[in-house]
Amino acid sequence: MPKRVLQGVVVSDKNDKTVVVKVERRYSHPLLKKTVRQSKKYKAHDESNQFKIGDQIFIQESKPISKDKRWIVVKDSVA
């Protein structure tokens, strides 16, 4: 099974080698019949501390790195 890749925005880089990424998804609400935006935050491993707040990045699923981290930063979405 391939590993999931998500795109999001860095909202926090205060932790060492960790960034918090906000991933937004859109779906059609079954009752209201309108598009709804929903976001979720993921902690991702950033080995070199190169990503800053506001950066658009891709994160990939990985084995557990710590209690909360199960994602690693793959690349910058601009590159």
UniProtKB/Swiss-Prot annotation:
> Keyword annotations for this protein?
Ribonucleoprotein, Ribosomal protein, RNA-binding, rRNA-binding
Organism whose genome encodes this protein:
Bartonella henselae (strain ATCC 49882 / DSM 28221 / CCUG 30454 / Houston 1)
Which Pfam families has this protein been placed in? Ribosomal_S17
- This protein's name: Small ribosomal subunit protein uS17
On assembly, the entry states: Part of the 30S ribosomal subunit.
Q: Which family does it belong to?
A: Belongs to the universal ribosomal protein uS17 family.
What start-end ranges are recorded for coiled-coil regions in this protein?
none
Q: Which gene encodes it?
A: rpsQ
Cellular component (GO) terms are: cytosolic small ribosomal subunit
- One GO MF term attached to the UniProt entry: rRNA binding
Q: Which InterPro entries match?
A: NA-bd_OB-fold, Ribosomal_uS17, Ribosomal_uS17_bact/chlr, Ribosomal_uS17_CS
Q: What does this protein do?
A: One of the primary rRNA binding proteins, it binds specifically to the 5'-end of 16S ribosomal RNA.
Q: Which GO terms describe its biological process?
A: translation
